Amino acid sequence: MERREPTQKALVLAGGGARGSYQVGVWRALMELDWHPQIITGTSVGGLNGAMFVLDLYETARDMWLTIRSRDVMELPEENADLSALHQFLRRVVKEGGMDVTPLEEIVERVLDEDALRAAPIRFGIVTVEQRGLRPRELTLEDIPAGQVRDYLMASAACFPALRARQIDGVKFLDGGYSDNMPTGLAKTMGAEELVCVDLEGVGITLPNLTGLPTTMIRSYWELGDILHFDPDTAKRNMELGYYDTLRAFGRIRGCAYAVDSGADSSADAEAFRAAFDAVQKEVREKYPVTLTADAALLLARMKDAQLAPLEAAAEDAGVDPTHFYTTRTLAEAFLAACDKERMESFAPLFTGSSTAGQAALAALLPNTFLQALVWRTLTTSALPEVTEDEGL
């Protein structure tokens, strides 16, 4: 019997500046899932992260993202600069074609070993763009002259005009996002047969995936922050989101906005919750001409897990932290702890049949708050009897 070669798996890392910390969380999950690529392609920060992934420098990447700030990546004006000094700084940035990224270059110089990168078993490619004519350049390590890998990594991340173009052998290069922020085509050219793509929704051009290859797309439901604002707290949050989003993409957990246990007990609770929620909503509709308006319906529609959708939408609106792992029950407890109980109780007449027309109108005018009230009513009556308002996380 002929032995079949293993599927050539590729990890495709999009650009997105400071949002790149999200990709480190993805990497952590992929290692736990025992998913190992033979090919990695990246644009901009995706290329920088990808190089560290090729070198198996997870701890280095994690620690770097948890410590760097914007000032460690690019030259910035003094924090207490007066208006005159700020104007002078901005004039110089415009004159010099963007901010100086020497601090980032020093990090890349310290972290990345070109010889080790070339010797690694994972094939690696990046995208950059020649400034003249905006000519795209898709480059594998074999295409890059010896001693210039760091230069081309910096070129791929030269987010002009905010950052300076990178000059190599007399040619100026720009961020690869000017051509292809998600280099799936390059991955296929390098021999990929299966893709995992990590989208940061960064600026630039993201070409449609026309490879025809089996693809798992990983992107965050939540905002990941400004692309030029590097901050340890945001990085830590993004890593957790990336970790849980990857587990969800591979079917290990459920939910949409929140990481929810997919085990039997939690799933049974989710089924019971949704049935009870629908019953509460039906009861209110039968008493009053009040239903969820378009805004709240849209909020529910964004949630892909139908059973958990009302609970997740209410939890989001109440400000429940998305960086924790929950069961259906603990997510319910977190919502009850976070919601405005006085506001929730103000909707009680709608559920008891003693509401006025004004209260019904208020529910229609505040669809998200009314959705929270429906979830609150569901959880404090029959849905999950052991969950109480006093059990918040």
Language model features by range: what are they?
Residues 1-43, 51-393:
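Patatin-like phospholipase
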